[in-house]
Amino acid sequence: SSPRKGGIRLMEALLETKIFKVSVERLLLNGGQTLYMVGIALLIGTVIGTLLALVLVLCRKGGLVENKVLHSIVSLYINVVRSVPFIILLVTIMPLTRAILGTTIGSTAALVPLVVYISPYLARLIENSLLEVSPGILEAAQAMGATTWQIIRCFLMPEALGSMVLALTTGTVGLLGASAMAGYCGGGGIGDLALTYGYEKMNTPLMIVTVIVLVILVQLLQMAGNRVSRRLREHR
């Protein structure tokens, strides 16, 4: 129908509109790639990071299931990965990325190094959150005959949730920066936009806008994280 065709043409015209010499379609595509990388990597990284943090807390000296060997292995792994700059980690594990996904280029391929990078980072942050829980609460749970799983699910995690939200907020900010670096190696996203269409083409206004967008995203994330954490602490 004519109205429908007119709407399609209008949408195409809007997508082809250029802002700082870059089409709106390209801006939306790269922005979506960043959200995709950060969202998926954060989800997987949070699960792995939480499991690693629980191992560190439960298996430490005096923990609920003390295991010095397992604690030392996990702690060493976390320290080693965290000590490697992300850009070096990105290049180093390219063979692993290729083995898993068959390619090292694209937003999906960037998920592998991003998850490897963020998991140990979140593990340390979540470990600190879990260690903030009063030992008296755990001792009371043990005295009531609660199992290790019940202590984790009903006492440890709920008490640490407010602090964990702040930890995840910090991790998300770090992940946002890492995703921008991933763009340098073909990961796409805002970083790729700034480098390919900004730096390499001497498009300074686009680079400035990219930085401003990243700053705004970080501020919004931090504000949201602080607010959620405060509410969780109040209703604990």
Feature map (PLM): residue ranges:
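C-terminal transmembrane helix and the adjacent membrane-cytosol boundary/short C-terminal tail
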Residues: V55-K61, M207-R236
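Periplasmic/extracellular loop-to-transmembrane helix junction in inner-membrane transport proteins
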Residues: L10-A41, N67-S72
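Short helix-to-coil transition segments within interhelical loops
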Residues: L130-A160, E200
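Transmembrane alpha-helices
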Residues: T148-S179, G225
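Cytoplasmic-entry segments and transmembrane alpha-helices of multi-pass inner-membrane transporters
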Residues: V55-T92, L114, S119, R124-N128
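Transmembrane alpha-helix signature in integral membrane proteins
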Residues: L27-L58, L168
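Glycine-rich helix-loop "coupling/hinge" segments at transmembrane-helix boundaries
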Residues: A178-I208, I212-V213, R233
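Loop-to-helix entry region at the N-terminal start of transmembrane alpha-helices
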Residues: L29-M37, R82, F86-S119, L206-T210
